[in-house]
Amino acid sequence: MMKRALTGIQASGKQHLGNYLGVMQSLIELQEQCQLFVFVADLHSITVDFQPQALKQNNFDLVRTLLAVGLDPQKACLFLQSDLLEHSMMGYLMMVQSNLGELQRMTQFKAKKAEQTRNPNGTLNIPTGLLTYPALMAGDILLYQPDIVPVGNDQKQHLELTRDLAQRIQKKFKLKLRLPQFVQNKDTNRIMDLFDPTKKMSKSSKNQNGVIYLDDPKEVVVKKIRQATTDSFNKIRFAPKTQPGVTNMLTILKALLKEPVNQSLTNQLGNDLEAYFSTKSYLDLKNALTEATVNLLVNIQRKREQISREQVFNCLQAGKNQAQATARTTLALFYDGFGLGSQNIK
């Protein structure tokens, strides 16, 4: 039987190269190997302050980008989290099975809590949604009973909580649940900032020259890569501790060479990048990285422009219907186990 995989992506603004290589590229591979569910996590987006118009546009832009990079609605189920009320219900069921202590010890919550101010009466001015976020995530996952959940390091603790909750529910309510396995793409899990390669590439970076966005035009990509941080070793090799900037560029280039649009460049550089660049300069590395990046982005941008709002809507409606069939089956299982619903009074 084909394994089932699930991932959720927040539509929090423009997508960058780190998003593509860290998540999207692996989804294109997974849709060929698994029954893949991909949802836009818009319920998670509203756990912090948000603007409705921006949320709607971000949702549209993300779905259009996912389709442009190669996610195929015939092979993967793509949908909006908020289109299925089952997500909210499962999130609530997970919340009542969790306890305050385990939610408060989540690293992301503690970090965001430290950034918050206090109200005049001394209470913390922090949205409750930030605290219950991991419970909703656990509900998202268990609703589809996946075998595989691709994750980044920043979500690993939340996913460990999901497994804990699943085991707790299995023991207490005698439900048979799949315990999902969490997988990471070790090569591209942490694409770093080009300007400051000690930090992960992020749209919140203070210096935007270190972030390559999927809608960046060629001249902007050329400028950003040309200004990328290197070092004084003048040696091109994978050395994360001593040469983080060069290592980051090699990592990105290696991942980009998997793309069909870079086949000719792959033939030129070969499989051993350290060997190829052993007699080359940092400028040669930057030129190769620029070519590979521009090839990818031009292809994505061209395809994005061809995707209409109607296509996005139709894709999401089809995905909603497909996802709902699975979600309702799972939620019915939980209702029976918990003793919820009028059907349990017959």
Curated annotation (Swiss-Prot):
ATP binds at residues 10-12, 18-19, 152-154, 191, 200-204. The keyword Transmembrane helix does not apply. CDD domains: TrpRS_core (cd00806). A motif ('HIGH' region) lies at residues 11-19. It is an enzyme of class 6 (ligase). Its EC number is 6.1.1.2. It comes from the Bacteria. GO terms for cellular component: cytosol. L-tryptophan binds at residue 140. InterPro entries: aa-tRNA-synth_Ic (IPR002305), Rossmann-like_a/b/a_fold (IPR014729), Trp-tRNA-ligase (IPR002306), Trp-tRNA-ligase_bac-type (IPR024109), Trp-tRNA_synthetase (IPR050203). GO terms for biological process: tryptophanyl-tRNA aminoacylation. A motif ('KMSKS' region) lies at residues 200-204. GO terms for molecular function: ATP binding; tryptophan-tRNA ligase activity. Homodimer. PANTHER family: TRYPTOPHAN--TRNA LIGASE, MITOCHONDRIAL. This is Tryptophan--tRNA ligase. It comes from Mycoplasma pneumoniae (strain ATCC 29342 / M129 / Subtype 1). The gene is trpS.
